[in-house]
Amino acid sequence: MIGGLFIYNHKGEVLISRVYRDDIGSRQAADSAVFSSSGPFPGEWLEARNAVDAFRVNVIHARQQVRSPVTNIARTSFFHVKRSNIWLAAVTKQNVNAAMVFEFLYKMCDVMAAYFGKISEENIKNNFVLIYELLDEILDFGYPQNSETGALKTFITQQGIKSQHQTKEEQSQITSQVTGQIGWRREGIKYRRNELFLDVLESVNLLMSPQGQVLSAHVSGRVVMKSYLSGMPECKFGMNDKIVIEKQGKGTADETSKSGKQSIAIDDCTFHQCVRLSKFDSERSISFIPPDGEFELMRYRTTKDIILPFRVIPLVREVGRTKLEVKVVIKSNFKPSLLAQKIEVRIPTPLNTSGVQVICMKGKAKYKASENAIVWKIKRMAGMKESQISAEIELLPTNDKKKWARPPISMNFEVPFAPSGLKVRYLKVFEPKLNYSDHDVIKWVRYIGRSGIYETRC
Amino acid sequence: MTDSKYFTTTKKGEIFELKAELNSDKKEKKKEAVKKVIASMTVGKDVSALFPDVVNCMQTDNLELKKLVYLYLMNYAKSQPDMAIMAVNTFVKDCEDPNPLIRALAVRTMGCIRVDKITEYLCEPLRKCLKDEDPYVRKTAAVCVAKLHDINAQLVEDQGFLDTLKDLISDSNPMVVANAVAALSEIAESHPSSNLLDLNPQSINKLLTALNECTEWGQIFILDCLANYMPKDDREAQSICERVTPRLSHANSAVVLSAVKVLMKFMEMLSKDLDYYGTLLKKLAPPLVTLLSAEPELQYVALRNINLIVQKRPEILKHEMKVFFVKYNDPIYVKLEKLDIMIRLASQANIAQVLAELKEYATEVDVDFVRKAVRAIGRCAIKVEQSAERCVSTLLDLIQTKVNYVVQEAIVVIKDIFRKYPNKYESVIATLCENLDSLDEPEARAAMIWIVGEYAERIDNADELLESFLEGFHDESTQVQLQLLTAIVKLFLKKPTETQELVQQVLSLATQDSDNPDLRDRGYIYWRLLSTDPVAAKEVVLAEKPLISEETDLIEPTLLDELICYIGTLASVYHKPPSAFVEGGRGVVHKSLPPRTASSESAESPETAPTGAPPGEQPDVIPAQGDLLGDLLNLDLGPPVSGPPLATSSVQMGAVDLLGGGLDSLMGDEPEGIGGTNFVAPPTAAVPANLGAPIGSGLSDLFDLTSGVGTLSGSYVAPKAVWLPAMKAKGLEISGTFTRQVGSISMDLQLTNKALQVMTDFAIQFNRNSFGLAPAAPLQVHAPLSPNQTVEISLPLSTVGSVMKMEPLNNLQVAVKNNIDVFYFSTLYPLHILFVEDGKMDRQMFLATWKDIPNENEAQFQIRDCPLNAEAASSKLQSSNIFTVAKRNVEGQDMLYQSLKLTNGIWVLAELRIQPGNPSCTDLELSLKCRAPEVSQHVYQAYETILKN
């Protein structure tokens, strides 16, 4: 299991050091520790120091770019993740579950962020006592323990520890929650207004050939839920999943044909740990008791019948050796009543470009020499519209034989619908103990489709 | 609020000040001081001098202060064991505290203090805490047992904590179960033999129930533990799989990977015919693909594991090529791994897409990545024959870019392509030669030199090119030196007249001026060969090279199976067994996949069925010999080339005319050679007569086994024998026999797929052999060979292939290739398949020849227990093309005079003596006369085989 956890700043100085096992640190270090046990450094501390230094020297101060997130130095393995300029490193001498260690490091970042916001050197120094407390709680002898902030916040706070003034009932409530089946939610939450927000966030990825043939396209989506619900509400989420719709439609043939069109085929999905997976596996129903506040309910991936919000039609003509003519048409492909936002088209230019002249019908376009691209920005664009840009690119004559590789034209945008076609059908809330019903809950649903890597070759 | 100030105190006398503050009466001040101490400790300052003062602060109601003191204690207790005892009382008291959080804190911290004296006091509180009413305390105590075991294993056993821990597996609280499982698993690792976890269907059921209820981390512990269980049969395996599959939808990638591990392992036990098996395969692909949308570090772990899964079960992800396409902003470690998997998944179906991608990657910026992409193009060419041409042209385009490292990498892979497809793409050599000057890496230089040497006859200025390398011979790396030596020797053998000086130069450089033993040895070998027997030298140095395998970097199957058991762990990331990076005995228990249950596949014995690889009997992986030692390798693999014993040839060190004698015969060997006798060595002429003595005694054993009945229409056909057992060929079993019918020879093969995957892309090749046997047509296996399917093929053979004397004479070395690997085996063919139809000699001719052949070439044999009369024998032999020229009766014995001719024109004359009237004597006597006496033994064996069947 994890032998120790260290947090460094960008210089490689240690901000947090928590050692769980004394096997970390090389054998050499152990020898020298014995040797110096009467000296100024106590043995165990020195060993850990050794691992700490090994990572600094070999990874943080390494001249080369990081070639692997897992490094083995003298039979000691170091896992690291980086958040802005802070390094988090987990150290072990055993054959640990590597995926678990990384998941834990991410979780650790989430927990810290939930307590004090951005992970920065200053914030870490300001909260070091809190971090040690958290590390003591969520990692015991290197085994990850309950790390849900909802539960942790009941007894570890930035203001110090609550539990000393708690009643016995409160204490046992804390412990049963931390160890219980629903570790992510505490009991006794109350809201005057029961409200929930659902965001369907999708990023649509495309690679298209110059002729308009789709080489690859997929949507990766997330359903993010923000819940402000009292008690321990039982929720059931429904969407237009093809498998569910077809199953339900079996009874009435009419409905199948009607709803069949609107349903979508989901390639794969994963769920937050609150979702009962066995139920999803057997009935494909998504039921759960949500954590309080914001969390990611599910992630999914689709590859079929994707609505591509924009089509890019490029035309590049080489006029002699020193001139390029580029014409790019973009067409919006969704309901005219909807508006796309933050549209940006990036047209790469050759390295030996000396000057560019651009004319565009809509928005603003600029040649950015430092980025070797023409950047065309349009604030808003309605559906079923089309716009065009033409540019003349002057080139410096070069004797470079290497042909310009013509990188693809990329696009960014945001649209108010889900390109996968996913629709939330319902989100039912039941709280049997409290006196509010599904109808009393105010629900909000929002769809945002953003461009992922949306490229057209030219 | 701003704790960062604690980090900034660096003034002198700090310790003294802290001491005063720690002993302050004010609570707040104390707490501040302890915080300062912890901050100093964190940045690496030694604050152990404050030990007594800090421990004094322990007795407090303030939980925060208490935790800080505990943190200090954990770090320094070991250095001050005597003082640490001071803390014991507080711990023991805290373990009785009404607040469960404090009880847990005390037992958790005590376990972290690795001082023997303290551990003694720990036992009682721990025992209580293991049975605490509060689950939070119990789950903490469970982990504490593992801590204590790490300090003092004996104590844990003596105190019976292991049993208590086992009881906790049945606890009502899922988190307690999970921690108990984690603790037990770790303890069990250090006691491989003790059946600590004692997994049985009941406990497995409990674990599976807890699996649904515990935290994500607990699920990982439980799944990792489940993976160590060995279900008793396929039904149990299936039911566990069914209950584990829902985990594939978990958001935590580690849960998914651990579930994949359980499924991959238990799948081994399921029969492939089951519907469920197919369903499971289908279910595995989407979650693996989804792992690729996780954070980059996890993607890396996932990709390393997918790399293993793709090797073990290629069918899972064969349609998912696109998701492994590299994204522009992937970190380099993700890019390199994706590339690796892309090559593994490349097939005829997707090769166009893959190539287009690889071409894009070759223009990226990261040098390592670009190199790997270029190399990948070469690997595609070798793997997918149909794409070879396109790959080569892509590589040529890349060479045109003149980017130094791209050119060098391209040359290295083109060398491999030449090896794989000889005489196909040599037209590009000219382009390669243009880039000679830009090569500065040893591997590329060596590759280029290999190409120049190998194709010396097509490169007009090969001698100049090689000479240019020779100038800086001693500054080159060893691989370049070795290659240069070999290349120049090759050149010399091909163009002996112009290059004599060059070869002497390189030989003396290698043998006299070099300290490298490898180089010297190789130099001497060539030298001796060239000076004693240039013809043999030619056969050695210019011998045909073994095929290179299309799949490179494959993990050895036993290791792969072991790594599959370690999916998700560091071992799977490093692709090394834990013993390679874990110290001591911990966690190095050898794991292996479960055996397939005997009920599902009765044909295979349970020991060999599961992975096909019990230790010691694993199939040999012959990796691509992409290295440049091709010639030497061939020397090792090939038959011994006989020449005069070395003792007779004195090595003339440094003699200028060391090649004097050899050169003539060498040049004479080439038809256009100047001078020299026009002596063409017959295939067997190079073999001294003394080697013709009884050889191949194994052959008779082989035929003793055969008892089937041959067909009468053609020559005798032996029943099929197993030539290549499945175990040695990753599941491909080959058996076969040879037939001769109406003048055509064929090899009747029976291919059986005993592996778990479909086999395709079969091809066959023979090594050079004594009679030039070679496939007359490619091996045609029309449909892919599914598991457990058998196909029968008749492969027509010709006798126009390259000739090389084998030992024994009728030995045939065969290489069979399929989509998995290349396999080598050798077999002995019966000589009678080489007896041609026009082997009947005219009487006069027979007499003349009989007299003409010297008597020492006559060999006598006895064929025992063969009660045939002359007519029967004669007709039997005739059907196998042994013709009776004359028959005589002398003193009651029938004498048959017979003749036969081999495919290479060698005549064999025979006298067969039969005693028909004497039932007590059923032995036949056979005298054979032949100009090539070494065939006699085999002709005799052919006689025996034909007559006795």
Swiss-Prot record, chain B:
Localisation per UniProt entry: Golgi apparatus; Cytoplasmic vesicle, Clathrin-coated vesicle membrane
MF-aspect GO terms: clathrin binding; protein kinase binding
3'-nitrotyrosine carried by residues: Y574
Compositional bias (Low complexity): 594-611
Membrane topology (UniProt): Peripheral membrane protein
Residue stretches in coiled coil: none
One Pfam family in the UniProt entry: Alpha_adaptinC2
Keyword hit for Acetylation: yes
GO terms classed as biological process: basolateral protein secretion; determination of left/right symmetry; heart development; intracellular protein transport; kidney development; melanosome assembly; platelet dense granule organization; vesicle-mediated transport
Protein family per UniProt: Belongs to the adaptor complexes large subunit family.
Connected disease: Keratitis-ichthyosis-deafness syndrome, autosomal recessive: An autosomal recessive form of keratitis-ichthyosis-deafness syndrome, a disease characterized by the association of hyperkeratotic skin lesions with vascularizing keratitis and profound sensorineural hearing loss. KIDAR patients manifest ichthyosis, failure to thrive and developmental delay in childhood, thrombocytopenia, photophobia, and progressive hearing loss. Low plasma copper and ceruloplasmin levels have been reported in some patients.
Subunit structure, as described in the record: Adaptor protein complex 1 (AP-1) is a heterotetramer composed of two large adaptins (gamma-type subunit AP1G1 and beta-type subunit AP1B1), a medium adaptin (mu-type subunit AP1M1 or AP1M2) and a small adaptin (sigma-type subunit AP1S1 or AP1S2 or AP1S3).
Protein name (Swiss-Prot/TrEMBL): AP-1 complex subunit beta-1
Lineage: Eukaryota, Metazoa, Chordata, Craniata, Vertebrata
